């Protein structure tokens, strides 16, 4: 019995392979049969680069067979027939080569490497159409020597913000609350000799922004932080400085002045014991009595319990 099932399965696979995968590829068109990435460097895996390709071949089950494409090709040309509709719904239409998307993929890959510090990266693409109605696209990448950070410094004009940005991780016990700031928040992501990676630079801005917002700078955002990169040494190294943009305050007369960023403090704290977000009745939210203790106002309504 198992032998018969195996034979049926082999016949089924042979039937799939024998089916034309270019049935719905028109004249002058090419099925995108395969995409290859060839790189001189070993820094990034092909799997890391594929998301930047604007066009991918049809899906391969277990990396062996484009069964969804074969199912689609089983359908007839009469789109109104129920069986053809079902086959096309279960299958996948052939991916037709689009040279515009190939060009865009080259640009995306080059932008990726530039953002990672490979400022002189070379990316090109070649298209092989020697097989009938099928195309193989090969992307060739030459990363060349990357730029690295030589010296990194912070030049934040506000002394309070500068001190917060340079905070060291506090010593906490193992039982410290999980909701408190983790030590990673205090560790700079930018290191000397590291790649001039723009994604890391952006994460560093966000790290400092998080530190500031947790300390009362609620109106602060990462756009107030910028960098100046000096590569004049011309040795694939960069001197990097972080700068702080001032807060621009508009006066009543319409003039704009640069000022320090504002740090907010908690003034009043009120606790409403009877508050129910599911109840819209205003009377239930109206306080019947107020108790002040340790600088906190406790308001409770007619259903609340006195805590005097």
State the predicted function of each range.
Residues 1-7:
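Bacterial N-terminal signal peptides that target proteins for export
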Residues 15-18:
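C-terminal motif of bacterial Sec signal peptides marking the signal peptidase cleavage site
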Residues 20-308:
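Interaction-mediating elements
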């Amino acid at each position: 019995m198992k032998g018969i099932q195996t034979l049926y399965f082999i016949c089924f696979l042979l039937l799939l392979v024998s089916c034309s995968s270019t049935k719905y590829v028109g004249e002058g068109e090419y099925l995108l049969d395969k995409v290859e990435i060839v790189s001189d460097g070993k820094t990034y895996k092909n799997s890391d680069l594929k998301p930047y390709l604007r066009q991918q071949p049809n899906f391969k089950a277990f990396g062996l067979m484009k069964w969804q494409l074969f199912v689609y090709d089983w359908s007839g040309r009469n789109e109104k027939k129920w069986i053809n509709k079902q086959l096309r719904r279960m299958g996948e239409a052939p991916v037709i080569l689009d040279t515009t998307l190939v060009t865009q993929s080259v640009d995306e890959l080059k932008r990726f490497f530039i953002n990672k510090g490979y400022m002189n990266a070379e990316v090109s693409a070649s298209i092989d159409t020697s097989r009938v109605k099928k195309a193989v696209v090969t992307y060739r990448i030459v990363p060349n020597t990357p730029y690295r950070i030589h010296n990194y410094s912070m030049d934040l004009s506000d002394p309070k913000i500068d001190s917060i940005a340079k905070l060291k991780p506090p010593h906490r016990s193992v039982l410290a609350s999980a909701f408190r700031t983790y030590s990673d928040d205090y560790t700079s992501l930018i290191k000397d000799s590291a790649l001039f990676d723009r994604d890391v630079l952006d994460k560093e801005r966000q790290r400092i922004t998080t530190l500031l917002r947790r300390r009362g700078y609620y109106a602060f955002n990462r756009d107030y932080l910028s960098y100046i990169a000096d590569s004049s040494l011309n040795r694939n190294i960069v001197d990097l400085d972080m700068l702080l943009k001032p807060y621009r305050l508009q006066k009543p007369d319409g003039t704009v002045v640069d000022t320090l960023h504002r740090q907010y403090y908690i003034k009043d704290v009120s606790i409403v014991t009877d508050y129910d977000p599911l109840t819209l009745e205003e009377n239930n939210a109206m306080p019947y009595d107020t108790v002040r203790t340790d600088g906190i106002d406790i308001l409770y309504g007619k259903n609340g319990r006195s805590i005097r």
